């Protein structure tokens, strides 16, 4: 025991081993002088005197027991005790019992900073707050005083660390120690590691008490000893699973590859961008955290069983006071719940499925739940920007029983999650994540260990489900935010372990009120699988699964191919709608000039509806070509080796070679780094660019066709409006002709009114005498005037010609009504105007007779 203790003065002569050199080189303390100075004088930190003052009596008793148990070193130990008493009076501080364990904790805390993968080099010398809290919690107060020293006894140490420790023990045992007063705390840590190395039993560790040591404030401290101590602590704590387990809550190892750990500069850059990254809680297998899924399933099942038990008790209690009618209430009271039934999973299909492991626990705890503490019947449901407020628990018991006893209704819970594997003929459909696995099955078995190629389709995920999926598959918070907020912009984004595609489809049900409304589809493509998200029911996923089953014997179905197939199916869904628009455009274009007597309002509505559909499809297709073009370009860059993958690999290789100064193994390091990087990253394959080019051609063709159809509809609309104007003009001409005839009759009756008016004055009225000759005279005059007027009017009408052109009609409309009935002056011109050839001849004569500037040269 005493051979392992050494002072700081004697430790300065220790030989520098190779493992220590490697440790110092890997830590690069030369680049950080503050870190080296801090470690050099790290032992000069003060320790409380209260622990020593309170344990004076225990110290004396332990001295007596220790001196009696170790007879060989009794003289040295007693001398140490005497000197310890003098030292304590002189103001120096010792380690005894809990005070010594407290000092050991302080040195172990410093080693945590080296184990933290996301701490900057400038912060390695300081103990972070969360690390201190975890360490204090890891050492329970109920443990014995040497509980911290007993950890890691059963764990094997690395070969390099054990050999380094043996060399230091051999060099330290060969020396003689002049005083036990100068024993350092480094020897205490070496002693602890040596005991764990030889498998010392905890009972024997209690008997082997170390000599009391003081902290030397001498400035000449050998950094080699401190580095060796740090390396030994790191190896001990690295193999201690019980201590590393709580530390994983604050680590970010799952989001850092080997390259990012090797490059401290790139790590600092990543830490400067403060995103709420998820902490590593479990081990990932092929990029999937199956333990997270298992925990979420257990929590969901427990909450579901508890809620079912509470509502079952409530329904049974209220059923005794109400009728046995189990039907739904009116739609006014369940309007909000109907939307929840459409988009969110229900508690359970039937109450008969409550036989689970957690049912006993639920039945035991149900009695302690008060009526006021019961949850609402319908909790608030939140997905993205849409939120359905839950309905408060009321007196409507018939609805509650029917809502939670679905065996009495014909309603089926919608399947919002679908799991598919490329080599499987089955597709698992479930209403929530825990229902994806059957009883006795695990998610690891469902995913086949995460081997390619799997596909999980999620419809209307809730916030909790989205949070679980993001933690399970390592989705970046920006991607999760775009999905939850339902980002409308189409784009392609490349991340470290996946790439994210946002693509739009539409509602293709003609009977739906949301026909042709856009639907956002989000695709997250990993190296071994695909995640898809959408907030409306779509048929593209089923079409792609059917296509995979047909082509998997001929095509290598991987995650990139699934992404291409889904985009291609979305693109092909536009073809039937565009074809129907083409037929409609041809029909309208032909009907514009043929339909005269049809209802013009229906025709205008038909044209307007077709134009609206065309503009909607053009808006949906406008951004897709650019997205596919950018996607294909990145695939080609990845094939040519000029993409972001090669750039990051080259930078990492250069940094690794510069730090380690390895010039001969650059090619080997580059291959290993490339392989490790490719295992943790996901880039679109180069052969997918060929398929994407085909999709781009389809998109451009459809967009150009829509442009042509929109022009046809626009021209047809203008032509039909022109036809309506012509019809309106013809109707006005008919009305004008009728009014002209009425005017002619009125003109004929005006002279008759003059005659009757004249004879109505105070004149001699014929017939005073007894003869009736005056009567026949008046009647004859009237008839004569009528006949004369008729012949004159007929002759006048024959002289008037109807307008032959629209210009003549417009000119005649500007004249008065009487002037339009006047005959034309040039009768010959009017006769020739009826013959087109005669008019051309007149024009030719007038053209030749006019002077011309070319005639003078003849």
Curated annotation (Swiss-Prot):
Annotated Basic and acidic residues bias: 46-61, 367-379, 386-395
Stored InterPro entries: Alr1-like (IPR044089), CorA_cytoplasmic_dom (IPR045861), CorA_TM1_TM2 (IPR045863), MgTranspt_CorA/ZnTranspt_ZntB (IPR002523)
Cytoplasmic-side segments: 1-741, 793-858
Coiled-coil spans in chain: none
UniProt feature, compositional bias: Low complexity: 1-14, 67-81
Region feature Disordered, mapped onto this chain: 1-81, 318-337, 365-396
Primary subcellular site in the record, as a coarse category: membrane
Pfam short name (any one): CorA
Parts of the chain that traverse the membrane: 742-762, 772-792
Gene Ontology MF terms: inorganic cation transmembrane transporter activity; magnesium ion transmembrane transporter activity
An example Gene Ontology biological process: monoatomic cation transport
Location relative to the cell: Cell membrane
Its membrane topology: Multi-pass membrane protein
Family according to the record: Belongs to the CorA metal ion transporter (MIT) (TC 1.A.35) family.
Its biological purpose: Plasma membrane magnesium transporter.
Other notes: Present with 2130 molecules/cell in log phase SD medium.
Protein name: Magnesium transporter ALR2
The organism's taxonomic lineage, starting at the top: Eukaryota, Fungi, Dikarya, Ascomycota, Saccharomycotina
């Amino acid at each position: 025991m005493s051979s392992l203790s050494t002072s700081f003065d004697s430790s300065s002569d220790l030989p520098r081993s190779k493992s220590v050199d490697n440790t110092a080189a890997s830590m690069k303390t030369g680049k950080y002088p503050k870190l080296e100075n801090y470690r050099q004088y790290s032992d000069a930190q003060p320790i409380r005197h209260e622990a020593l003052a309170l344990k004076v009596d225990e110290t004396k008793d332990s001295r007596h027991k220790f001196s009696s148990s170790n007879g060989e070193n009794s003289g040295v130990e007693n001398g140490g005790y005497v000197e310890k008493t003098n030292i304590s009076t002189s103001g120096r501080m010792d380690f005894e019992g809990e005070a010594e364990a407290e000092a050991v904790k302080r040195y172990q805390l410093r080693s945590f900073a080296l184990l933290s993968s996301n701490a900057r080099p400038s912060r390695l010398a300081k103990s972070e707050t969360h690390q201190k809290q975890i360490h204090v919690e890891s050492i329970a107060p109920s443990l014995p005083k040497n509980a911290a020293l007993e950890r890691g006894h059963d764990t094997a140490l690395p070969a390099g660390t054990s050999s380094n420790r043996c060399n230091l023990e051999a060099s330290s045992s060969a020396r003689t120690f002049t005083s036990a007063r100068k024993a350092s705390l480094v020897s205490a840590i070496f002693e602890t590691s040596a005991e764990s190395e030889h498998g010392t039993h905890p009972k024997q560790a209690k008997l082997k008490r170390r000599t009391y040591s003081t902290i030397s404030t001498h400035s000449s401290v050998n950094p080699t000893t401190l580095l060796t101590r740090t390396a030994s602590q790191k190896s001990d704590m690295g193999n201690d699973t019980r201590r590393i387990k709580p530390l994983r809550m604050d680590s970010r190892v799952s989001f850092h590859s080997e390259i990012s750990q090797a490059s401290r500069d790139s790590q600092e850059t990543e830490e400067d961008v403060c995103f709420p990254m998820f902490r590593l809680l479990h081990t990932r297998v092929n990029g999937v955290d199956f333990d997270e899924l298992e925990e979420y399933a257990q929590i969901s099942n427990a909450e579901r069983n508890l809620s079912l038990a509470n509502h079952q008790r409530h329904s049974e209690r209220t059923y005794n006071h109400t009728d046995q009618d189990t039907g739904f209430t009116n739609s006014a009271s369940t309007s909000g719940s109907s939307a929840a039934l459409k988009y969110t999973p229900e508690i359970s299909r039937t109450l008969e499925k409550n036989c689970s492991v957690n049912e006993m626990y639920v039945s035991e705890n149900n009695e302690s739940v008060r009526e006021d503490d019961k949850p609402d019947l319908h909790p608030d449901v939140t997905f993205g920007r849409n939120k359905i407020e839950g309905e408060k628990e009321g007196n409507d018991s018939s609805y509650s029983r029917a809502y939670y006893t679905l065996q009495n209704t014909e309603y089926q819970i919608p399947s919002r999650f679908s799991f598919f594997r490329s080599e499987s003929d089955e597709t698992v459909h479930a209403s929530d994540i825990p229902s994806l696995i059957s009883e006795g099955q695990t998610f690891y078995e469902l995913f086949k260990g995460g081997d390619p190629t799997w596909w999980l389709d999620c419809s209307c995920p809730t916030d909790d489900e989205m949070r679980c999926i993001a933690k399970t598959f390592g989705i970046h918070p920006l991607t999760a935010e775009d999905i939850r907020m339902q980002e409308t912009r189409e784009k392609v984004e490349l991340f470290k372990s996946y790439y994210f595609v946002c693509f739009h489809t539409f509602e293709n049900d003609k009977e739906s009120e949301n026909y042709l409304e856009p639907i956002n589809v989000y695709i997250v493509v990993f190296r071994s699988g695909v995640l898809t998200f959408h907030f409306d029911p779509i048929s593209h996923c089923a079409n792609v699964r059917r296509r995979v089953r047909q082509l998997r014997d001929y095509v290598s179905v991987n995650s990139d191919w699934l992404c291409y197939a889904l985009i291609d199916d979305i693109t092909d869904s536009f073809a039937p709608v565009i074809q129907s628009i083409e037929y409609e455009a041809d029909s309208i274009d032909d009907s514009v000039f043929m339909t005269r007597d049809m209802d013009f309002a229906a025709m205008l509505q038909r044209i307007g509806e077709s134009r609206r559909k065309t503009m909607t499809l053009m808006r949906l297709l406008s951004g897709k070509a650019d997205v596919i073009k950018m996607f294909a370009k990145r695939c080609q860059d990845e094939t040519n080796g000029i993409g972001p993958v090669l750039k990051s690999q080259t930078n990492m290789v250069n940094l690794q070679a510069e730090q380690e100064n390895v010039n001969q193994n650059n090619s080997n390091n580059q291959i290993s780094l490339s392989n490790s990087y490719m295992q943790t990253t996901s880039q679109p394959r180069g052969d997918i660019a060929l398929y994407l080019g085909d999709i781009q051609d389809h998109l451009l063709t459809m967009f150009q066709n829509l442009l042509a159809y929109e022009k046809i509809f626009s021209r047809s609309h203008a032509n039909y409006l022109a036809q309506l104007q012509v019809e309106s003009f013809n109707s006005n001409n008919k009305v004008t002709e009728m009014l002209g005839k009425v005017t002619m009759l009125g003109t004929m009756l005006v002279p008759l009114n003059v005659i009757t008016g004249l004879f109505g004055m105070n004149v001699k009225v014929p017939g005073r005498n007894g003869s009736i000759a005056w009567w026949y005279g008046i009647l004859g005059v009237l008839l004569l005037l009528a006949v004369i007027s008729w012949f004159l009017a007929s002759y006048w009408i024959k002289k008037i010609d109807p307008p032959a052109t629209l210009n003549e009609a417009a000119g005649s409309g500007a004249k008065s009504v009487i002037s339009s009935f006047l005959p034309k002056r040039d009768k010959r011109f009017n006769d020739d105007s009826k013959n087109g050839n005669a008019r051309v001849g007149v024009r030719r004569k007038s053209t030749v007779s006019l002077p011309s500037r070319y005639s003078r040269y003849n």
